[in-house]
Amino acid sequence: MSTTPTPGIALNFDTDWSYDPAPESTDIAQIDDQYDLFINGRFVGPKSGQYFDTMSPSSEKKLSSIAEANDADVDAAVSAARHAYENTWSKLPAADRGKYLYRIARIMQERAREFAVIESMDGGKPIRESRDIDIPLAAAHFFY
């Protein structure tokens, strides 16, 4: 096998070495400055007013502030969930419940790269583990 160019044929290499961002670039991660609790179909601040910071282990930079739920918040969330289950969810036919669960799984798959990047930023784990194991397994739990 010859490694020399064929006589009379010029090899022209493109000198534009610009690339798109890597699929695992942190640019895909849209992280808000603060996250509240999701209770009864809406986002609400914690009753205590307390938040904790989540930090990136790799850079030690703050990613976001997360609402810190206390007993009253947990009680409100459980009460809302119980009410939703007893009055709505349990009355839906199984096929309809399955459609909702399937849609959640599909949304998780559609946003898998974003979730994997955020999980790796937050937990410090290798992107390959988040991307190839954690997020696909989380979505798989919702498939009906």
Q: What does each model-found stretch correspond to?
A:
Residues 1-65, 99, 103:
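Terminal low-complexity tails and localization/encapsulation signals of metabolic enzymes
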Residues 59-144:
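Glycine-rich loop-to-alpha-helix module at the N-terminal edge of alpha/beta enzyme cores
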